[in-house]
């Protein structure tokens, strides 16, 4: 899709006149002319029009932002006044109106963010097109100067959103209406042992397209507060969130050896695959505390055990060389280190020395964390502006990092997007990464709002995704022999069509969403109260998009039908005789199995209850089947050609023509079958691909032709007195 069509499709109609006029600027560039001429007058006119468009967009941006701040400040004043000792309390009706106003502010923030991003992208594209058409009039430096005066690209909506949803949670907690959000637990429940056998830990990772990041943030903020990080150290949470850092820059330095053994172990899902990284927040200074994290992945799942300890920046070199003195750490911190921590440090040192580990990859991203302080039941991380940078010294002649040092100093003070780096030293990830960590009891379901988010059109789940594995696969491709599966789908658009996701019952997540919709309806009916409450946007979409219902025929009627028609035989049951489970089908024919009362028939087939994922081997199996059929065609065609050219015999020529027609029929059948299965794979249809009648018909036709050919040949031999009729059976069986 061209950008002119994209900006037209993304326009919010009430603000149409406030957008940049991209077609007009494109027309001024004379893109429609074959050999356009460009002079000073054309340049001056284009720059003046573009500057006026930029000022118009920025003025409207400031106007809407001012209105938003005024609305939020007004709600904040109401809430603050009610919290005073002698302040008037907020009634339930007033609280609902304030919540509606905050919801309106949230929707406006989403529209304003999309408006700003769309216009800013348009300006960058038109400047790039200008410099490409007329390189003698470089406009990019001038545009960068104008952007400093109209800083559309440096606008941060997260502080405003955090304030909105802080008020939102305060007002919602004062209402008695139930909520699907994770509730804030009392202090005496914060010390729950989530590592016990009663709880299960699950981790999900998703890719989020830049167009959906703001909507994902606003949806999560309705249910979880944003974590603030203290200015001293990132992993210490600021409980009051007043003077903290909202979206800190997080840096991870991964360690591996020249053979990338840790990468291979994690990619192959070994039983105990280690990962080792150095982690810190903000700029790296001599006083920065470095978090050493050792992770051990258990099998093929994303679950892993994680151990960590903290050291100062000046001690990292000693740790990597195996000369780290644990007793000095005790003196520096004036604490008595436990034996467990001492053993952890010794194990990490042993892991580094035995495997010759060294820093190879740096991962830098902006992290937005959502979690109730002190509660590990649900934690969500949203990592944006992710850049992967080589930190290795594998190339002796041109090392990216000084082999005598443990990190690159040219990156420590640099900022995103690190344009000073050479091509091939870094790679920018095009999406944001969403990670959901939940720890729930085995007898409980996950919160409904998380189920809605996981199955929505806003995010795309990637099984087994790892930042380290992706970074190595992109930047060190020539050093490794295996690549993760998701690398091959990087060029695909991860955005999903809203109508297809929520309306199509046979889509990738359609069947599961039908189930979620019905479960949500049951919960809403159970929790329904007279007080109005604001439903989540995803529930509204589920209600607005009607789906095809699943058959609700009573089980008794189906049993009656089976009892009445189960003993009848018809030709439609012939394919069933060819299945491998024929013996089991006849053995249990006519029997009725009684299931326990707590087991119910699933509303949807289990084989389509989750996302249908097509692996590469499915395509290869279809191609292999087609080639097998072509092999049969070639053999049959060769036989037909040999018979047709057999010493001028009319019988051989006749059957040569018959075999040729049969080969053409088989080739046409194989082609149609291959095309049909390819279409089913592309559409991810859950229908079976088995074809019973095709091989049966082809085999029968071939057998009949061979029998007829043999009978005619024998008859001709008898007719020519080559075989005596009374000795025919003797000739056949000797």
Curated annotation (Swiss-Prot):
Transmembrane domains' residue ranges: 625-645, 651-671, 694-714
Modified residues (Phosphothreonine): 529
Membrane-topology descriptor: Multi-pass membrane protein
Cytoplasmic face of the membrane: 1-624, 672-693
Cellular compartment(s): Vacuole membrane
Mitochondrion among keywords: no
Protein name per its UniProtKB record: Vacuolar transporter chaperone complex subunit 2
Organism expressing this protein natively: Schizosaccharomyces pombe (strain 972 / ATCC 24843)
């Amino acid at each position: 899709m061209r950008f002119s069509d994209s900006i037209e499709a993304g326009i919010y109609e009430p603000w149409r006149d406030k957008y940049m006029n991209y077609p007009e600027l494109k027309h001024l560039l004379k893109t429609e002319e074959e050999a356009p001429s460009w002079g000073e007058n054309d340049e001056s006119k284009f720059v003046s029009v573009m500057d006026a468009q930029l000022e118009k967009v920025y003025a409207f941006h400031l106007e809407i932002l001012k209105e938003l701040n005024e609305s939020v400040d007004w709600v904040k004043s109401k809430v603050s006044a009610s919290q005073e000792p002698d302040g008037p309390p907020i009634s339930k009706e007033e609280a609902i109106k304030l919540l509606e106003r905050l919801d309106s502010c949230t929707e406006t923030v989403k529209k304003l963010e999309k408006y700003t991003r769309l216009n800013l992208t348009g300006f960058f594209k038109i400047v790039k097109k200008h410099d490409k058409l007329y390189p003698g009039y470089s406009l990019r430096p001038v545009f960068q100067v104008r952007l400093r005066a109209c800083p559309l690209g440096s606008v941060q909506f997260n502080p405003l959103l955090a304030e909105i949803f802080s008020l939102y949670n305060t007002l919602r907690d004062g209402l008695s209406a139930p909520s699907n959000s994770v509730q804030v637990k009392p202090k005496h429940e914060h010390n729950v042992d989530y590592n016990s056998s009663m709880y299960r830990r699950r981790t999900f990772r998703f890719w989020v397209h830049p167009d959906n990041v703001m909507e994902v943030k606003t949806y999560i903020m309705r249910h979880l507060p944003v974590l603030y990080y203290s200015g001293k150290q990132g992993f210490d949470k600021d409980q009051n969130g007043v003077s903290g850092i909202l979206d800190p820059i997080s840096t991870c330095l991964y360690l591996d050896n020249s053979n990338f053994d840790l990468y291979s172990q994690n990619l192959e899902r070994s039983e105990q695959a280690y990962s080792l990284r150095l982690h810190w927040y903000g700029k790296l200074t001599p006083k920065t505390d470095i978090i050493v994290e050792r992770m051990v992945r258990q099998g093929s799942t994303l679950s892993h055990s994680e151990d960590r300890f903290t050291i100062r920046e000046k001690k990292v070199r000693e740790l990597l060389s195996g000369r780290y003195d644990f007793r000095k750490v005790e003196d520096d911190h004036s604490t008595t280190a436990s034996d467990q921590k001492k053993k952890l440090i010794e194990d990490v040192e042993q892991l580094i020395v035995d495997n010759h580990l060294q820093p190879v990859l740096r991962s830098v991203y902006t992290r937005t964390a959502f979690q109730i302080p002190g509660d590990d039941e649900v934690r969500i991380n949203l990592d944006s502006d992710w850049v992967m940078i080589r930190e290795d010294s594998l190339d002796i002649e041109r090392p990216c990092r000084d082999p005598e040092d443990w990190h690159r100093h040219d990156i420590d003070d640099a900022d995103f997007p690190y344009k000073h780096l050479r091509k091939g030293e870094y790679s920018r990830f095009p999406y944001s990464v969403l990670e959901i960590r939940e720890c729930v009891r085995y007898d409980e379901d996950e919160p409904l709002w998380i189920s809605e988010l996981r199955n929505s059109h806003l995010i795309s789940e990637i099984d087994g995704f790892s930042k380290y594995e992706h970074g190595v696969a992109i930047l060190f491709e020539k050093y490794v022999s295996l690549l993760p599966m998701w690398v091959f789908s990087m060029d695909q658009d991860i955005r999903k069509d809203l109508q297809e996701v929520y309306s199509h019952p046979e889509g990738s997540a359609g069947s599961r969403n039908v189930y979620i919709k019905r479960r949500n309806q049951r919960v809403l009916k159970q929790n329904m109260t007279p007080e109005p409450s604001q439903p989540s946007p995803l529930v509204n979409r589920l209600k607005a998009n009607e789906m095809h219902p699943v058959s609700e025929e009573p089980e008794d009627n189906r049993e009656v039908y089976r009892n009445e028609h189960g003993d009848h035989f018809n030709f439609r049951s012939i394919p069933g005789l060819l299945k491998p489970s024929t013996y089991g089908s006849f053995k249990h024919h006519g029997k009725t199995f009684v299931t326990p009362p707590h087991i119910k028939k699933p509303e949807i087939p289990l084989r389509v209850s989750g996302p249908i994922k097509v692996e590469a081997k499915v395509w290869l199996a279809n191609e292999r089947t087609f080639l097998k059929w072509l092999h049969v065609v070639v053999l049959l065609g060769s036989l037909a050609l040999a018979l047709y050219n057999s010493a001028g015999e009319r019988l051989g020529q006749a059957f040569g023509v018959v075999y040729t027609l049969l080969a053409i029929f088989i080739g046409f059948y194989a082609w149609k079958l291959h095309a049909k299965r390819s279409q089913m794979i592309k559409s991810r249809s859950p229908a079976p691909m088995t074809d019973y009648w095709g091989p049966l018909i082809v085999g029968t036709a071939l057998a009949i032709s061979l029998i007829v050919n043999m009978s005619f040949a024998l008859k001709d031999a008898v007719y020519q007195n080559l075989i005596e009729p009374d000795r025919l059976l003797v000739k056949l069986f000797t």
